[in-house]
């Protein structure tokens, strides 16, 4: 049998004749600047910030990101292929799924890109808050899609990537240039002062081979 009682701000549990005491969080005085473990926040090691040239290089070198949408009750995060033209990021979205509705409901998002070595001796990541807009101009859409075709070929990506872009893996990559099975999104309204780029201590991301 378990009998629980409250005495002088402590919780006592009587089990098999033994008394266990758990100090209530309300009975432990907290000092300003200290967390619940008693470690002063001033002692916490902070990861180094990335310079603009560093996170620009990270964005240029990678091609997979995560986009966080506002969602309903919870935020919704989805992975995307992207291309970067040195100024803007573009994404190819299949025309189905919750991400499409979340984009229509609220185009304000945060894009996250990361790089890390298998043993985490090197790692870095950057988050970019901004606004997604859908590209409607036919010429611009084709230009961006052609760059995605080039990305998939140059990175030697599996045909399975086509299934994430609204196409069958059995289709040639050039099928991205035909039909309306996907949409082109562009990240805009990114303010440099809102970009957060962090890296591991002494990390220097290596360019992919």
PLM segments and residue spans:
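Charged, gly/pro-rich active-site loop segments
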Residues: 26-33, 38-39, 44, 122-209
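Short beta-strand segments
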Residues: 62-95, 111-112
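Short hydrophobic targeting helices and cationic amphipathic motifs
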Residues: 13-15, 27
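Short, basic/aromatic recognition patches
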Residues: 39-66
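Short, solvent-exposed aromatic-acidic interface loops
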Residues: 94-98, 149-152
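Helix-adjacent hinge/juxtasegments
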Residues: 98-106, 110-133
